């Protein structure tokens, strides 16, 4: 059925080193557990699980209650890495082409939140 997991803060997570545990089943039905250090995430080369952990930590508003990430991210596997900033640009362009101004503005907001995160590093 695809990638399925939950996120929780690690017991040793701190304000200076926020750490999240992702635990679940990958797209092949194999169980996994990953430790994600938020400060080490690079949205220009990240997995979907890393970005969902970053999204949760930052409290980015979710479109329709699901995710702030572009729709294409839903097709990614556990270890697939991509440039989410490029993915956002493509999604914004697609939404503008379809005259979906509110959706385009939402993805612009989301992308800006992740740019701000990268610029704080």
Enumerate the language-model features and the residues they cover.
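Type III/flagellar secretion export determinants
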Residues: 1-121
């Amino acid at each position: 059925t695809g990638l399925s997991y939950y996120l929780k803060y690690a017991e040793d997570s701190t304000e200076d080193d926020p750490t999240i545990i992702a635990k679940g089943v990958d797209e092949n039905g194999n169980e996994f557990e990953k430790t994600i250090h938020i400060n080490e995430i690079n949205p220009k080369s990240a997995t979907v699980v890393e970005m969902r952990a970053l999204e949760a930590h930052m409290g980015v508003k979710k479109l329709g209650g699901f995710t702030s990430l572009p729709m294409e991210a839903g097709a990614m596997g556990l270890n697939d890495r991509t440039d989410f900033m490029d993915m956002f640009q493509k999604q914004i362009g697609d939404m503008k082409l379809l005259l979906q101004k509110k959706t385009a503005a939402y993805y612009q907001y989301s992308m800006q939140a992740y740019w701000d995160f990268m610029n704080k590093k």
